[in-house]
Regions:
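Active-site glycine-centered loops adjacent to acidic/histidine catalytic or metal-binding residues
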Residues: 16, 116, 228
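Well-ordered alpha-helical segments embedded in enzymatic catalytic cores
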Residues: 38-42, 97-101, 171-172
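Conserved beta-strand termini and adjacent loop/short-helix elements that scaffold enzyme active sites
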Residues: 61-63, 85-88, 144-145, 173-176, ...
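Catalytic-core segments of class I nucleotidyltransferases/pyrophosphorylases
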Residues: 111, 125-129, 133, 162-233
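Short, well-ordered coil/turn elements that cap or connect secondary structure elements
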Residues: 5, 53, 77-79, 135-137, ...
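N-terminal glycine-rich phosphate-binding loop and ensuing alpha1 helix
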Residues: 2-69
């Protein structure tokens, strides 16, 4: 683990109450297999990023009801430099507020990774490494999965992606659209360049113009959203 300035900062927002998940424990710690819980699957790409040789700082945004999650993350101290910050109650009580809380602690490129999203498909664990290297020229790159289920897209960051391949770009983007027709994908992770990172909270604003339009896209086969149990892709 490096204590020097990071090449990439990963924001991990863990302050939510998991109302839709409906369990009496933190959804991040829901068991998927012996010794593996949801947040472990969510962090696979982050660990791969650190093992690629880049210096990675993980900024975990939490509240006191998530101290069990904080304790679980101690097992990642060997691979990741971690900073824990209590979500600022003076900010909006949502994803945007969590991002704003974390931003003063970020350096370098900034990635947003959600603790209830797990990538699936061959090579998906390398997708964040690829996305970090593809933020230019727009200053943005998304890890995304194509999916056409309207119910899924209404609960996610919906995208319209252009042609498949290494040159895929975001043509349109909207957070949890009421009318998802015209969208064919959703993002699982977002990476911003240092000059664009201050705009990260905007991706969580419903009905607002999204800074993700024009972003590069790294495609994965799919991802599981453990908050709503829907899987695009």
């Amino acid at each position: 683990m490096s204590t020097s300035s990071p090449d990439v900062t990963v924001i991990l927002p863990c302050a939510g109450y998991g109302v839709r998940f409906g369990a009496p424990y933190s959804k991040e710690l829901h068991s998927l297999a012996p010794g593996v819980c949801v947040i472990d699957r969510s962090l696979e790409a982050v660990v791969e990023l650190a093992r690629s040789g880049l210096r990675v700082r993980l900024v975990v945004v939490f509240r006191t009801h998530k101290l069990d999650v904080v304790g679980h993350l101690a097992s990642y101290a060997r691979d990741l430099s971690m900073v824990f910050v209590y979500q600022d109650d003076s900010l909006e009580d949502n994803l945007g507020g969590a991002i704003r809380t974390a931003l003063p602690l970020t350096e370098g490129r900034v990635a947003l990774v959600l603790p209830d999203i797990a990538l699936v498909g061959p090579g998906s664990e390398r997708s964040l490494v690829e996305a970090v290297g593809r933020t230019e020229p727009s200053g943005w790159c998304v890890v995304a999965s194509r999916g056409h289920d309207p119910d899924a897209l209404r609960e996610l960051g919906a995208l319209r992606l252009g042609a498949r391949g290494t040159g895929a770009r975001v043509l349109a983007a909207e957070e949890k659209p009421l009318r998802p027709d015209g969208f064919n994908a959703a993002w699982a992770m977002v990476v911003a360049s240092p000059r664009q990172a201050h705009r990260l909270p905007e991706i969580a604003l419903k009905g607002a113009d999204s800074p993700l339009v024009g972003a590069s896209a790294v495609e994965v086969a799919g991802f599981v959203n453990f908050n709503t149990a829907v899987t695009p892709g």
